Amino acid sequence: MKSRLRLPILLLALACPALFAADAAAPRWNILFVFADDWGRYAGVYAGIDGKPSLNDAITTPNVDRLAREGVAFRRAFVNAPSCTPCRSSMLSGRYFFNTGRGAILRGAIWDSAIPTFPLQLRDAGYHIGKSYKVWSPGTPADAPFGGQTHAYEKSGRAPNNFSEEVTARVAGGMALAAARDEVLAQVRGNFDAFLADRKESRPWHYFLGVTTTHRKWVKGSGQALWGIDPDKLKGRMPAFLPDVPEVREDVADYLGECQAVDAYIGVLRARLEAAGELERTLIIVSGDHGMPGVPSGKCNLYDHGTAVSLVARVPGAKGGRVVDDFVCLPDLAPTFLEIGGVKPPAGLYGRSLLGILRSDRSGQIDPTRSWVITGRERHVENAREGYVGYPMRALRTADFVYIRNFRPERMPMGDAKTAFDPKVLAGNTLTEETRVGFADMDASPTKEWLVRHRDDPRWKRHYDIAFGPRPAEELYDLRKDPDQVNNVASDPAYAKIRGEMGADLMRRLTEAGDPRVTGDGLTFEKPPFAGPVIEESANEGSSKKASRKAKN
């Protein structure tokens, strides 16, 4: 009898080796991951952590805050690259963004299927996996690191990607605001329920909700109309790089409203977990792919406003109410999820597992070696500059300083002005609606338009220069004195020693990591396929394109 059982088991092991490779000591929790486009470090929990006036004073996120009370909030969580596709390439693989082939750029990205990613590795280790909306995009094939659309659950609807547009349209059609919101939230619930219903037996699962809600565009005035966020409450709380004027405050309030929509989605998913009896065996973790879009120092910048993100987790069986000061970079999530699933991480990872920190009962600095992160970017919008080239940057962030190396300071950081100053452009609201008119590495927005219109006003010229002006080869910011990173002290003799040390440390780490920007001839990213015109991807971007009406940048 035993010999007859051994043969089929042996054949199954040979056919599906990954199913038998899982570490028996691994927790094998379910993993619920909410990952929002352009969601920076904005949640109510951070207002208390920051300890000073900030934009977080104006946002209400009861569901994220509850996760933090029951789990852990990371004070120093950063993306590896503040641009959608390269950030996701890095996060999904656990590698530096510059080690992901054509995944290192935005427009023109093509996924290298030879690079392992945590969702597919979990699938091969016996997890039931599923996703709704955006995982990896723009790029070809869309969502390739998650298996494309094979594991998509979106039949209940895609309205959650465009919360303010969808709810505003329903209200304009005569629906009550509460009913309109509930109708959109029902689609989040329906897609997740369909995913859970598909699970075979009691297999562990991983679900990825990738909403584009917080990506522009959104409805002007929606922060107050839909969420009651008063733009005037932001007065005196704006960071130094943002003009503290009504137009910009309203724009920021609208963004915070979309962040609150993401919080509502998190609440829906948590409620479904409780109803299904799955809450206490599920890791819930929430974050975003970079900072605020369409504003100075945000998306596509290596200042904290561009690279710092929310990261909050509820961990089964762990102590809640913790705030961790360790530096965390989103590539750390891949080895974390793999360790939870009992999967051996592949070689070549930059990220390090956070499982020990998640299970710890301590706050503050837990791992003393987690004292820095590296961030960077290459090309974002392909035609932002003449020659279809990017604006290469790398940065080293520590507790007290941010050091930035701009490898091509002769280029414009947000792209060429193009027709941004054309009277015909300024006659309307083109800079609010069309990103590629000028400075294309900053999303179209009311803030962008306001800055361009006030570029010659002495009161606001510094804000304009921070947003669009040229930058030197080196930048250094003393966070103890300048938390908003607006006073570059790289040329100050008093900082010569720290500038030299951080510059050398950054270059050493990049060289050790095999960054093509600093190894070989250093020109890899200056040549096709990383530079030059992009042939428009066709059907390969299909689902992600359908999933959202947001711009693909």
Residue locations for each model-derived region?
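Formylglycine-dependent sulfatase
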Residues: 11-15, 21-475, 483-504, 518, ...
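Structural signature of FAD isoalloxazine-binding scaffolds in flavoprotein oxidoreductases
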Residues: 479
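A glycine-rich phosphate-binding loop feature that marks nucleotide/adenosyl-phosphate handling sites
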Residues: 522-526
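Short arginine-rich
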Residues: 511-514
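Bacterial N-terminal signal peptides that target proteins for export
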Residues: 1-9
